[in-house]
Curated annotation (Swiss-Prot):
Pyridoxal kinase involved in the salvage pathway of pyridoxal 5'-phosphate (PLP). Catalyzes the phosphorylation of pyridoxal to PLP. One of its GO terms (cellular component) is cytosol. GO terms for biological process: pyridoxal 5'-phosphate salvage. It comes from Haemophilus influenzae (strain PittEE). It is an enzyme of class 2 (transferase). Pathway: Cofactor metabolism; pyridoxal 5'-phosphate salvage; pyridoxal 5'-phosphate from pyridoxal: step 1/1. Its EC number is 2.7.1.35. Pfam families: Phos_pyr_kin. Substrate binds at S9, T44, Q45, D224. The keyword Electron transport does not apply. Belongs to the pyridoxine kinase family. PdxY subfamily. Homodimer. It catalyses: pyridoxal + ATP = pyridoxal 5'-phosphate + ADP + H(+). This is Pyridoxal kinase PdxY.
Amino acid sequence: MKNVLSIQSHVVYGFAGNKSATFPMQLLGVDVWALNTVQFSNHTQYGKWTGMVIPQEQIREIVTGLDNIEKLQECDALLSGYLGSAEQVDQILFALEQIKLRNPNALYLCDPVMPHPKKSCVVANGVCEALIEKAIPVADIMTPNLHELRQLTEFPINTFDDVLKAVNALIAKGVKKVLVKHLGSAGKINDPDTFEIIMATPEGVWHLSRPLYQFNFEPVGVGDLIAGTFLANLLNGKSDVEAFEAMNNEVAGVMKTTFELGSYELQTIAARFEILNPSSNYKAEKVA
């Protein structure tokens, strides 16, 4: 069994961060060592929540504890998502350094969660800058959305060609795989009823489209689900393109179930059989 140390947010109610990623990854046969960066009552897009940011030193202590019982050599990947403070970025890098010492082949997937002007996603000051400065040089995989891609590259991105230039800039900096979630108006198809996503590697760029469900309130945690299931499929031995397609079909099933149930929260439990055996078969097209 493959193991992932997943360092991201936790919500008591609902599905975001580790709550969104853990169960689907475990369904796919990958164990998740969940280490929380924050513990909130619910995700921040409700507009009100309670809870706390986990002190940065706790991350280091827990990683050290795992090393003390000689478990870091069993860690196949590090996954980072929503961070509660800029200082936590340094603790992520400490975790990566320790894991790589014990398992040099371990992967690092950085989901660079950043504030969005059209969403109530609250991110602490300095996190964006710390991710740009410190995470890009060491990440094997990054999974930004379109807005986060703009912030990571500082490129103006309005067209599909702009997206390609931006992802190639990240690849040039050493990131081996870049997934850009929900291209929106910068998509290749640019249809409001179509969800578009790309994967870029040094070998090329692949594009995939599937239906975009028109929720009254867009569920949170979809990016966490995408990052987690993509990583799980890679660890299970699938090729980049196979993992990209499998993830998209698994996530498509979760989104379809969530929409049909009229839920604001992702319905990963109700959609568990869609994760295990997706009913869709969307295929990626190489575009560059």
